[in-house]
């Protein structure tokens, strides 16, 4: 099924890495080898998305290292120095602003921009997100500049440590309790984000950091692109206890489409139907409520189920949600309204 009820349901997708890919210059007109671009967004009914800027570490491993105990672990990437990260992130953000200048997207700076995009008229809306805050100086002097430019979402860490906290490494099987949490600079960062109106994303933060953010009560807790740890025991997924806290704060989990975080064995190869995405969504909904479930594909950052392939077939995911019992109204909430509510809570609290 390519649509729900014979029409495209508007979708807000909570995470993609398109701006960081080598073929980023094809985002406007189409990227044959990419998972997300403007034509694919339109075909899939994606009227809004969070676009991440991210600085890759030099020499990152592509494959996990098996430990003597059988656990799979990716070597934790080294921290990127602030000057290099700031330059890299600024270049990637500039690509988004160029798309805005040329009329291909509208960069969201207020909740009204999200609302205006849902009708399907005009350009889709893009939320600028910094994934891993090495691009921000520990004194936070540059954060106001980033906010003025359009930054509205930030993850304090990627899956490595930095001045703000400790990322959760990619380990399977493992809990997300992999070390210490936020530093004093990280606590100050979260507080300043809340003051400005920048959503704080927890998807790459370890469990100690998650609870540090929860104690600050800065806003609804958000894991923009994660799965349910009960279904796949990867360290990057969210435990039941974390889910309960996300629900209690009015937050959400954007269900990730990355095959390893969906399969119970963490493998990229083998059977990976779209139904796995729906299974994680169903689990989270049954645990804490449909209002806390959203979508966070990680397009262009991870392998996705082959039957999905790319953003042009996003409506297939909504069809899979219907197959596991989500009603039409619930699908619309998962596809759009839940993200809209949480973004509004963070942005209007400032």
Spans of features found by a protein language model:
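Divalent metal-binding pocket/active-site signature
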Residues: 134-137, 146-236
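N-terminal hydrophobic targeting/anchoring segments and the immediately downstream early-domain regions
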Residues: 1-176, 233-295, 299-350
């Amino acid at each position: 099924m390519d649509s729900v009820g014979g029409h495209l349901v508007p979708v807000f997708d909570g995470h993609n890495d398109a701006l960081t890919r080598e073929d980023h210059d094809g985002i406007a007109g189409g990227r044959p080898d990419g998972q997300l671009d403007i034509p694919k967004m339109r075909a899939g009914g994606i009227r809004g998305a969070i676009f991440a800027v991210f600085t890759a570490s030099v020499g990152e491993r592509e494959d996990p290292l098996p430990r003597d105990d059988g656990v799979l672990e990716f070597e934790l990437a080294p921290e990127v120095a602030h000057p290099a990260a700031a330059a890299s992130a600024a270049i990637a953000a500039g690509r988004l602003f160029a798309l805005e200048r040329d009329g291909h997207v509208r960069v969201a700076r207020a909740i009204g921009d999200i609302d205006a995009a849902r009708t399907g008229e005009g350009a889709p809306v893009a939320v600028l997100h910094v994934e891993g805050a090495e691009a921000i100086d520990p004194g936070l002097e540059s954060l106001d500049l980033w906010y003025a430019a359009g930054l509205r979402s930030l993850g304090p860490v990627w899956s490595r440590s930095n001045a703000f906290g400790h990322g959760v490494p990619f380990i399977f099987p493992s809990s997300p309790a992999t070390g210490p949490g936020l530093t004093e600079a990280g606590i100050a960062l979260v507080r300043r984000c809340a003051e400005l109106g920048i959503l704080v994303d927890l998807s790459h933060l370890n469990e100690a950091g998650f609870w540090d953010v929860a104690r600050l009560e800065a806003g609804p807790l958000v894991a923009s692109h994660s799965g349910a740890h009960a279904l796949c025991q990867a360290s990057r997924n969210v435990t039941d206890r974390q889910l309960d806290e996300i629900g209690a704060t009015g937050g959400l989990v954007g269900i990730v489409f990355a095959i390893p975080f969906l399969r119970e064995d963490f493998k990229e190869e083998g059977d990976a139907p779209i139904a796995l995405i729906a299974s994680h969504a169903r689990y989270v909904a049954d645990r804490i409520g449909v209002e806390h479930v959203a979508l966070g594909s990680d397009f262009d950052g991870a392998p996705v189920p082959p039957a999905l392939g790319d953003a042009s077939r996003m409506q297939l995911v909504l069809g899979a949600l219907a197959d596991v019992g989500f009603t039409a109204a619930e699908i619309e909430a998962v596809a759009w309204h839940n993200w809209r509510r949480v973004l509004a809570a963070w942005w209007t609290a400032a």
